[in-house]
Amino acid sequence: MKENDNDNRFINNVNIDYELLHYSSTLFYIHVTEVWIMKKKRWHIMPRDTEKENTLIRELGVNPIVARLMVNRNIDSDEGHRFLEGTLKDLLDPFTLKDMETAVALILETIEAKKSIVVYGDYDVDGITATSLLYRFLVKMGARVSYYIPERQSEGYGLNLEALEHIISDGASLVITVDCGISSYDIVEAVCDRIDIIITDHHTAPPQIPPARAVINHKQPDCPYTDKNLSGVGVAFKLCQALWLRQCGEWYLDDLDIVALGTVADVVPLVGENRIIVQAGLKKMNELPNLGIDKLIDVAGLHDKTITAGHIGFTLAPRLNAAGRVTHATRAVELLVTDDVDLAETIAQELQETNMERQEIERSIHEEARANVATQGHLADYVTVVAGENWHPGVIGIVASRLVEEFYKPTLVISIDDGVGKGSCRSIEGFNIYNALKSCEDILIQFGGHAAAAGFSIDASRIDELRHRLTEYCKVQVSPDEYIPVVSIDATLPVDDIDVDIVDRVSALEPYGMGNSTPIFGVMDAKVQDIMLMGQLKNHCKVILSTANGSVDAIAWNRPDLFRYIFQGMNVKVAFTLQKNEWQGFVSPQLMIQDIEPIIEEPIQLSAEGLREIYTIVRLALKGGANSLYHVEQEILRRKPTNQNGSSALMALDVFKELGIISEETNDSGQAMIRWNVINGKLDLTTSVTFITYSQQEVIQ
């Protein structure tokens, strides 16, 4: 093709079936701009109760914005004192837990007799920390103790008979479970005449409690313990407290950083005892942490940060979890129990590398699963069901969560191995995924879980049937509104009021977690001073908002799509959480974007003439080869005709991809690239779904 032929490159055939277009436009709109439409959210601004707010201001002396946040969390004046000022002295008596006396007596008797004890744990962070805590404590008590954690893929969660038989044959006298065991009635019954078992667990108790020597679980019937929110490591900590109190006459307060790590990671409500434990544990983590945790902080690049619950949940816990997902969780336990600096450094680095491996496996499966949704025609399904051969079963739950974030539909991700699919499910607010699976139990091999997350296995030949059954189930059980995620806004703020002082005042509510969620604020009208992609892969977005005194940065992780419809000079509304940004000694407020929308959305309209102009820009940017998607998008926005808005100009890339002019690929670093393809002859624009959809807006609206 000659250089000057590009003006005549496109043919615009207008013989369009408008009725079909009207029917299809919604589906194609989802296909072409899937990230955009799936990110649309409903804002719910929580109503105020100024009378309650004023009571808190008067009786607790808190800032008005803090009072409003406390009212939103149903915290009154009495509870407010404990919430804001609770200390370790307020922890409950561990002996009020049912069977604690029996457990303490049996453990002390076993230690005195120098008999062997095995701590039987679990491979998630709650189980890892509970195992580490109790093992360290029993060593301190002079016990002969070892630990056992089942392998995720071959053994699965909880007690298994084969493992217990090995433990018995090795001569153990007592098994103490942590974070598991409450549902293992048959297994405990099979071995309880040959070995003593103490169960410590926090999961919901079934009707039949296992016949162990002692069962410590605050959720079992007739347990008078008033705090029902402890994690698995929290229950193990209460056992340590009781033993130390009986032996030494004082509270056991060591290893609180380990307890905090598991408590945050298990996403239990951070209220009551959990809040006190996590506050104290974070203090220790920042002042004199466990050696293994300290080395984990180093490899995670957090050594110069004040560690928060957020750092635990999003940075430290995933590195410990990676061991159980990709290799074996015992390595994570070794990190937390060692006193050898060199060994701790070695294991921490191993976990860092294992986590990177987990991320790569997850990224690969996520990309394949995401592509399956689009290419197999399931974008408009009521439920997302994707399957792949030999997907790593240790990460499919994470992939399911990511797909829920993108498409906001109940999601099942299935790994097929030797004709059998092992699935992991994640749900949306208000939809019970466990009940959905139960409606299909006749075609499942097995299943289990709860309302928000579940797992199952199925013959691979029945996956399509499962998709159909769940689709029909969701048609009845899920309303259209439930497919739109809701952002609950605690309070609205003028953008000019956002400063470091308000961040400091709001931090009185930390640590955040389930039951005390991170406050979300809303700015209803702010002007975009600038927008840019950031990160090595250009997969994060920074939006700079104008303020009366300058500007404030707003960050959106994993939202490169914002670059396509938020532009300089726009007025936007933003839902966000607040945090400090500390850089080279300078401290400033920073908004973490939860949602952002233009006040006035720019209509997307495409024309053959406009595409010809963008075609020239793209061709020059690629120079017959390849370049980063970010660079090409920047060139389009910089050089586009003034009569085209940014959204329409960037949408041209989707048209070009559908016509085969360009293709998208990923380089060795994982960065999105655009490659120029040599195409001979004329191109028919009506073969582009995107062009048909957006060149006929007036017809289909």
Pin down the residues of each PLM region:
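Histidine/acidic-residue-rich, glycine-tolerant segments that coordinate divalent metal ions
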Residues: 171, 178-230
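Hydrophobic helix-and-loop "lid/oligomerization" segment in the mid-to-C-terminal part
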Residues: 37-39, 46-174, 194, 244-463, ...
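Short alpha-helices
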Residues: 133, 210-264
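Short, Lys/Arg-enriched N-terminal segments with co-localized hydrophobic residues
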Residues: 22-37
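Acidic-glycine-rich active-site phosphate/pyrophosphate-binding loop
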Residues: 109, 204-217, 375, 545-550
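Acidic, two-metal ion nucleic-acid-processing modules in DNA metabolism proteins
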Residues: 139, 144, 275-318, 322-370, ...
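Acidic/polar hotspots within intrinsically disordered regions
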Residues: 4-6, 13, 18, 31
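Generic structural signal for hydrophobic
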Residues: 167, 190-191, 656
